[in-house]
Amino acid sequence: RRLIAASQPIRGTLVETYLRHRCIHDLHDVGALRYHPRCYHRPDDGGPTQTWAAMIASVTDLGGLITGAHRTWLDPSGTGKAPLETPRKAMGSLLGHAVRFGLAHDVMAAGEGIETMLSLRMALPCISMMAALSAAHLSAILFPETLRRLYIVRDID
């Protein structure tokens, strides 16, 4: 929660540049995404800690309570992810929860990646979307009782 509180909205930031470079231009209902200009990155091998600009995504439960955060460290040019061995990491309680775009209704779409779901959101702007962050988490995601139709979005990777 502190990381999310220390970050800022994405408008006019490197996150917006990164998403637009990914051809994601329609950025509505993206309050779950934030920007941190100097987010710590600790390598898995125990190397020195570095700071990079990052896209911070709030992971929330069905009630909107923040349960975790997902970080995508960005290249300073905004053209892609930072040149790190692991440019994405999540922390907190993720199982059953998701990064949410739009208000939950009776029809929703759920998939793994943030960028995948935002790309689909451009074609289907009225459907709420959820990014589970991994295939394992997608299989465990909790859905609202109001859900009547669910579209599962497949990543090609």
Predicted regions and their residues:
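TOPRIM metal-binding catalytic domain and adjacent DNA-binding surface shared by DnaG-type primases
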Residues: 1-55, 60-63
